[in-house]
Amino acid sequence: MEYGIPYISINYSGWDSHKRHFETMKRPTAEMDMAVSALLTDLNERGLLDTTIVWLSGEFGRVPKVDRQPQWNGGRNHFPRCFSALVAGGGFKGGQVVGKSDETTDHWKERPVTPQDFLGSIMELAGVDPDDRLPNPKWLKEYGPVMSPAVKSQCGRLKEIYV
């Protein structure tokens, strides 16, 4: 960030816990907790947090019910209805929670949030116009929209957590 790099993506695998979920998650959750804490602290101390957006999420949550069948041994399958994500810095207020699930985390109860809402909010706060055209990575001579019209039409905003 200090060198003007506009975008960094980090892929940290090992979260697909269909088997032995709680045992499997001990290591990556501890590592992620320490890494995100250090990143946010460092960005804040260097005066970069206000101009840097940090987004941490997966593409879905995990089913509320733990599968105790022998072949899964405490696993949890994919679950798109409820999930957790984190955004920080770059125009987002800290310490906020948006949305709420029911008591069993089987359905949303208040203010459903979608991945498209995160995308729309991040693009807006980063000053990216979704109608701009960027080189298509498959055919570098052709240009395509930053966001397809189908995705753009579904993008809400998380304005309740904007600074």
Which ranges hold each PLM region?
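Ligand-binding pockets and gating/stacking loops
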Residues: 1-163
